Design a protein with these regions (language model features):
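Charge-rich, low-complexity intrinsically disordered segments
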Residues: 219-292
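Intrinsically disordered, low-structural-confidence terminal and linker regions
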Residues: 1-19
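Acyl-donor binding region in acyl/amide transferases
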Residues: 129-232
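C-terminal non-catalytic accessory extensions
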Residues: 281-309
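Short, solvent-exposed loop/turn elements at beta->coil junctions and helix N-caps
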Residues: 91-98, 211-215
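Short amphipathic alpha-helix that is part of the acyltransferase structural core
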Residues: 45-96, 106-110, 115-116, 308
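Short, His- and charge-rich active-site/binding loops that engage polyanionic ligands
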Residues: 108-142
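Conserved N-terminal entry element of GNAT/NAT acetyltransferase domains
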Residues: 16-66
Length: 309
């Protein structure tokens, strides 16, 4: 009920228009550009090491029902509207065929039976990848290089849970799932240039193209990046396996190599078989109806991908 009231209050609200195609905090971005990667990593770890990541009572796992998927998508829509790159729609969520594909896994962070964070792993398919709409040539080049591709998308965290390690734990679950269960070799992501330094210097993503405006997201700027998952563990070990780069998770000391590649966390619950939740035709149609989308508005290719044709 509270969510419905919030949606109706904000329904139709135009995104905040940021000067030009987007607002970049030039001073911050310019400063980060000149920070050496090793120093950037030390500063980042120092910041998160101030407090132990408190994940007690949290659960991080793939969605298990259509209700959970839709709650995650509502959280994404709220987050995008708050950032000014989308409007709040009547349903509180926007339809995307990518989230219903057999190769897509949507992860959620759950606390007190509420979904407070989400991120999705979208594997390459007959529909391609979402970032191809803006960075088509870059994705084609990655395909030509061979290997299994997937895109990281729709990261969102509820307002009261930012700064508590929720994104790191979601990424932990998603990385392990992609590497060990789905055989993904390269992760692609499109981020705002403001976040580029974090992904390059901390998670070792590499730029694969130029910054472009993302038309569907109020012309927000989009930087395409790629991470070679096959080499990531060795890179993380070399960069992070040292005492000066440690931090705590629930009072236990760790570092990013151990955190992402070795330690197991009971709060992260991944299906042992590596199977992805498949949505049947009735669930797909139900979700479309809730989003105000009719089957006749979908292309034949999308209908085939969703097993509706």
């Amino acid at each position: 009920m509270l969510h419905s009231q919030r949606v109706m209050t904000n329904f139709g609200r135009k995104p905040r228009i940021h000067s030009g195609v987007d607002v970049i905090r030039h001073s911050m971005v310019s400063l980060e550009r000149y920070i050496p990667p090793t120093l950037y990593r030390r500063l980042f770890i120092k910041r998160i090491a101030r407090h132990s990541l408190a994940i007690e009572g949290f659960e991080f796992r793939p969605v298990q029902s259509l209700f959970e998927l839709e709650e995650a998508l509502r959280l994404v829509n709220d987050s995008y509207a708050r950032r000014g790159i989308s409007t709040v729609c009547r349903a509180g969520m926007r339809f995307s065929a990518f989230h219903l594909l057999p190769g897509t896994t949507t992860f959620v962070a759950i606390k007190d039976q509420q979904i407070v964070g989400t991120v999705s792993l979208i594997e390459d398919s007959m529909l391609g990848l979402p970032l191809e709409e803006v960075h088509g040539n870059e994705v084609v080049m990655q395909r030509l290089a061979g290997g299994r591709l997937a895109e990281v998308g729709t990261l969102a965290v509820a307002a009261g849970y930012r700064g508590k390690g929720v994104p790191l734990m979601l990424y932990n679950a998603m990385f392990r799932w992609a590497m060990h269960f789905r055989g993904v070799q390269r992760l692609l992501i499109a981020v705002h240039p403001r976040a580029g330094a974090f992904y390059r210097n901390v998670l070792f993503f590499s730029p694969m193209g130029r910054v472009q405006p993302y038309t569907k997201l109020n012309n927000a700027l989009s930087l395409p990046l790629c991470l070679d998952l096959g080499n990531a563990p060795a890179i993380f070990q070399q960069a992070y396996q040292r005492p000066t780069l440690g931090f705590s998770v629930e009072g236990q000391r760790t570092h990013f190599f151990d955190f992402f590649c070795r330690s197991d966390y009971a709060h992260i619950r991944l299906p042992a078989t590596g199977s992805v939740r498949r949505w049947d035709a009735q669930e797909v149609l139900t979700h479309m109806a809730r989003c105000g989308v009719h089957g006749r508005n979908l292309s034949p290719r999308v209908q085939r991908a969703l097993a509706l044709a």
